[in-house]
Regions:
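FNR/FR-type flavoprotein reductase catalytic core
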Residues: 78-144
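Ferredoxin-reductase
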Residues: 2-93
Length: 144
């Protein structure tokens, strides 16, 4: 499928290098699975072209209202071209979105015999590698 336009409906700067962004595709929310990622494309002024980068979806698949991303701006050795532009966008601005892709993050909550599996789950991730785990935690909370 081709890229689709999406509007920014929410931004929150958590730290000088960490932002939460929520996007709504203009054509409606596609189906996706918790743990997937998609590409965000923006015109990069310095290069006079659209540049796309992959970002993990931090919202869970049961959320049909928006995509949420937690994005860190790494400036060394060189700042990311798309990430840098994302930090300067505002509510109402538009970006291009690719289709959700990648494997989903599934942890079964039942044994094969149907009995509930009440063991604790430990997820390890660093930096913005936490985004899929945020999605999983929301999914787990809302489905159990």
């Amino acid at each position: 499928m081709a890229d689709t336009k999406a509007k920014i409906i929410y931004t929150e700067l958590l730290k000088e290098d960490l932002v939460v962004i929520r996007l709504v595709p203009i054509t409606g929310m596609p189906k996706y699975k918790t743990g997937q990622f998609l590409t965000i494309g923006l015109p990069v002024r310095a290069e006079n072209k659209i540049v796309k980068r992959a970002y993990s979806i931090a919202s869970h698949a049961e959320n049909r209202d928006y995509f949420e991303f937690v994005i860190r701006w790494v400036r060394k050795p060189l700042p990311g071209r798309v990430t840098t532009e994302l930090f300067y966008l505002s509510v109402g601005d538009e970006v291009l979105l690719g289709d959700p892709t990648g494997d989903d993050l599934i942890i079964e909550d039942k044994y094969r015999n149907g009995e509930p599996d009440n063991r604790r789950v430990v997820c390890v991730g660093g930096g913005t590698g936490l985004a899929p785990f945020i999605a999983f935690a929301h999914h787990f909370r809302d489905t159990n």
